[in-house]
Amino acid sequence: MALPRFCSYCAAPLPAPPPVTCRACDTSHWLDAKPCAGALVARGSQLMLVRRAHEPWRGAWDVPGGFCGPREHPKDAAEREVREETGLSVRVGSVLGMWIDTYSDQGKDADKVTLNIYFHATVGTGAQTTIDPNEVAEIGWFEADELPCDLAFPGHIPAVLRAWREGLEAAPRPAARAARPASTRKPEPSL
């Protein structure tokens, strides 16, 4: 990642890499992580993944998601990204976890440090997908034990999927209902 060498306000040389304060104008410079949000959209025991249609990681499978807009809550960003990429409206639930990674624009820009926040999400029955070909080449639904290996962002997506799978394994199973004993009470008379 190329670090800034000059102040973005007054163009004076910076005395050190960020975080640093410019000696000439007192402007602070930081390399903050860019917030990103994604949704692990489940349908029963299956997870939806999208095959990326653009770089970086064109052709690799990914969790639907992307950068948060200015002042956009990560939950809202996750819902928006799923809708933009797949046409689905989802209900975002609890946080699965957070991971730090980098996002490379293939030489167009310095790599960005990203803070990636992932949420559990569900989609209503009968919902139809609509692919945005600029973003997504394909949508796939995968069982937890059949997730693909060709994954985007290997610095964190494998860990995200592992956490999702471990959550499924740890989830309490519905208990079988015990048969109720027959009531010995007489029914109330009807009025």
Predicted segments with their positions:
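A generic structural micro-feature
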Residues: L31-A33, W57-A60, D109-L115, I131-V136
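Conserved N-terminal beta-strand and adjoining loop/helix that marks the start
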Residues: A24-M48, F67, H120
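Nudix hydrolase/Nudix homology domain
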Residues: M1-L3, G126-L191
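A short coil-to-beta-strand element that immediately follows conserved catalytic motifs
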Residues: A16, S89-M98
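Acidic, metal-coordinating catalytic segment for phosphate/diphosphate chemistry
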Residues: M1-G38
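Conserved Nudix-box catalytic region and its N-terminal flanking loop in Nudix hydrolases
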Residues: A42-E84
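Active-site-adjacent beta-strand/loop module that shapes the phosphate/pyrophosphate-binding cleft
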Residues: W99-Q128
